[in-house]
A protein has these predicted regions:
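N-terminal hydrophobic/helix-forming segments and targeting peptides
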Residues: 1-447
Length: 447
């Protein structure tokens, strides 16, 4: 899909973008990105349309001032950058980081379960999923399949069934009168999607169904067999504007495709002579320890090749700043005691700076002050969050990337409700406010 790029300049040549204009592109991106593979494909296409070159990791790179380029890893992580005219050692690099993955249900390698007259699919929980909201939804399946063609060549393709093909029905309350009393879910036994009635089954199993879908979506590929796959269930309900006055945006995968899109738009829209870079890692929701994750060498390798030698890299990183953008917990009106009384971010209140004394976030006083100044320049309100002292908090790619690179980092994010649910909610104004702050990072002459 093509990421929508709306006009952003007023008559004075200043950046101006309404929430409606920005969110139309964001919602299209969310709907077109049911898996990290689809998200990276959409971002890659948007960058290519704006003249970014695809880099081959096995080739020698020729990079100089004015280079606009991108590179992917595993087709689920992406780095894109624009190189300024000044030496990197003298200017550093302005970096925005986000992640492409979201908690979900992944299809197991041998998924076919036949019992009680129905065909079901075995799934594995990916990340910290809120399981209850996955029940009674119209679910589809999307992701990457690896196949062989008629010549025996191996190729990987993206598929998306788009229509609802599986569901996980709840057990009726008449059969579970204690359902509202300390409910627990057994993901092996109770979270098993139903694919269809065995009486109507004509395929030999899930792999045959995949092969038919590949033929439908990629008839030109002459695929003969599906060998393996990385597929996820997802909710077919599209992103929507909600609330009596349209105050909110509800969608799957706001954590963290909202930040990916805001970073992408900032990279594409920035009018700057600075060297700027966007990194969108996979596997954040499961710890980032992978070749495509923030603990892997992907970003360090790209920066090293950009700089040319370790001396230039060290000097460039010493002048660089990373904004790690990952959504933050907004105050929930039904559970307001879950927030520290002095740290209660609100929807439509602007980006949130994340603080944690135990380094679960990489923010320090200097990087927080820099981000506040960027927001002031952009005319964007800014909020802060620190968890209750008796509650643990999550983490982001911020501390990991900061540890790997030694780069100054601030953790921020748009406020949202329902984090890690199948459907999440943010303020209607919050995506564009985050974008405006990130754009200021790329466009400011000095930090």
């Amino acid at each position: 899909m093509s990421v929508s790029l709306a006009p952003k300049l007023n008559h004075r040549g200043e950046h101006i973008l309404s929430p409606e204009s920005f969110n139309s592109g964001l919602m299209a991106f969310l709907d077109a990105s049911p898996s990290p593979f689809h998200a990276v494909a959409a971002m890659r296409q948007a960058l290519q349309l704006q003249g970014f070159d695809d880099l081959d990791p096995t080739a020698t790179w020729s990079i100089g001032g004015g280079t606009n380029a991108l590179i992917t890893r595993n087709h689920s992580s992406l780095i894109a950058f624009r190189v300024g005219t000044a030496p990197l050692a003298d200017t550093g690099i302005r970096i925005i980081g986000a992640h492409t993955d979201s908690p979900c249900l992944r299809i197991k390698p041998s998924p076919d379960v036949r019992r009680s007259g129905v065909h079901q699919l075995g799934v594995e929980v990916y990340g910290g999923v809120l399981l209850a909201p996955w029940f009674d939804r119209d679910l589809s399946i999307a992701g990457r399949v690896t196949c062989t063609d008629a010549q025996g060549r191996r190729l990987s393709l993206l598929i998306d069934f788009e229509r609802p093909i599986v569901t996980i029905p709840s057990l009726a309350i008449h059969l579970n009168r204690d359902v509202h009393k300390n409910r627990t879910l057994n993901s092996q036994q109770e979270v098993v999607p139903i694919l269809g009635d065995l009486a109507n089954e004509t395929e030999t199993g899930f792999h045959r169904m995949l092969l038919d879908q590949v033929h439908h979506q990629h008839p030109e590929s002459d695929v003969q067999a599906v060998i393996d796959y990385e597929l996820s269930c997802y909710d077919t309900q599209c992103a929507q504007r909600v609330g009596i006055h349209g105050d909110y945006l509800a969608s799957a995968r706001l954590d963290n495709l909202l930040s990916c899109y805001a970073g992408l738009r900032s990279l594409l829209d920035a009018e700057t002579e600075q060297s700027v870079l966007l990194v969108c890692n996979d596997h954040e929701e499961v710890g980032s320890a992978s070749a495509a994750g923030a603990q892997g060498p992907f970003l360090h390798t790209v920066l090293e090749r950009l700089c040319g030698d370790t001396e230039t890299l060290a000097r460039a990183l010493a002048r660089s700043l990373l904004i790690s953008a990952d959504n933050a917990h907004a105050l929930h009106p039904n559970y307001d005691n879950k927030h520290d009384p002095q740290h209660q971010p609100r929807l439509n209140g602007g980006p949130v700076i994340k603080f944690n004394a135990n380094q679960r976030y990489a923010t320090n006083s200097e990087t927080a002050a820099t981000f506040r100044e960027l927001c002031t320049r952009a005319g964007v309100p800014v909020q802060s969050i620190a968890m209750r002292s008796d509650m643990a908090c999550g983490s982001t790619i911020g501390p990991i990337t900061s540890t790997v690179l030694g780069v100054n980092t601030v953790d921020v994010g748009a406020p949202q409700l329902g984090m890690h649910s199948i459907r999440e909610t943010t303020g209607w104004k919050d995506p564009v406010l985050l974008y405006q702050a990130l754009l200021q990072l790329f466009e400011s002459e000095k930090l």
